[in-house]
Amino acid sequence: MAHFDVVLFHLLENKMEKYVNSILMIRPSNFRRNIETSKNNLFQKKIKIEKKQNILEESIKEFDGLVSKLIKCGFKVYIFQDDLKSDTPDSIFPNNWITFHENKTIAVYPMFAKNRRLERDRRVLEYLESKNLKFDQVYDYSEAENEGFYLEGTGSMVLDRINKKAYCSLSDRTSSDLTMEFCDDFNYMPIIFNSYHTINYKRKPIYHTNVMMCMAIKYCIICLNSIDCNEEKENIVKSLTDDKKEIIEISESQLELFAGNMIELINEKGSFLFMSKSAYKSLDNNQIDKISKYSTIIYSPVYTIENCGGGSVRCMIAEIFN
């Protein structure tokens, strides 16, 4: 095979996982602060909006605003409308219970909170299939929750889909054994560590890896100060450096404003980094300049979703590679 053909082959081989064909998002019908998840999601806050209906209305407005910006950037967004049949206050965060992979493969995950398990709704896949998206293989890890083991999708794991590495910060919601099982099934190399943030002068585990770390093709945004073990920190830095990624550090105060909960999406127009307005406002000029070398920054206000749900823009998006 000629050199050009080899290069072209590898580009085509990687294209499915490099370029996002489309996105799944769940439009909420019952969004509110989830008491079940607040046990270990310490990013959730009680906000001044008192009425449940007002919280829902604000969250829908924020959701629709983000969708509009995604579409404007050229991304196909499949929107599944949640209903009131099930008590699913966190349905707006689908990336925790389902991930999509090349070769028409999906994975379904075990969830810590009982009311989040209701989000695994067959109707979501039926909706996507009605849009001519086909899925030939399902890896279902959900039964592990019956034994008290959890792995909440790309919340628990930050995937480097090009270099096939899964970065995973352990917590009540993230099992080391399940991470290893996923990595065996999908041929990823696990990089497992612990990360913390300071709450009332005490170091508490960060509930999801994607709050402290955002993986992009050419760079990684990460709060290295949240990793207390020097050996674990050095291992991550080496892994990122070996993959020739520029490391863009954020502080713990920026982490608290969801500066780690961003997502790079790439299409024919180029690389875009989507984030919340609060995350963007937390960045300094140097960080913005570093990101802008590689990606167009797009930010959207999701204050209600962040404060009530304890998650931000990255959590709202499930990338589809099909």
Predicted segments with their positions:
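Positively charged N-terminal leader segments that act as targeting/secretion signals
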Residues: 1-7
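The feature marks the mature, well-folded catalytic cores of soluble enzymes
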Residues: 11-322
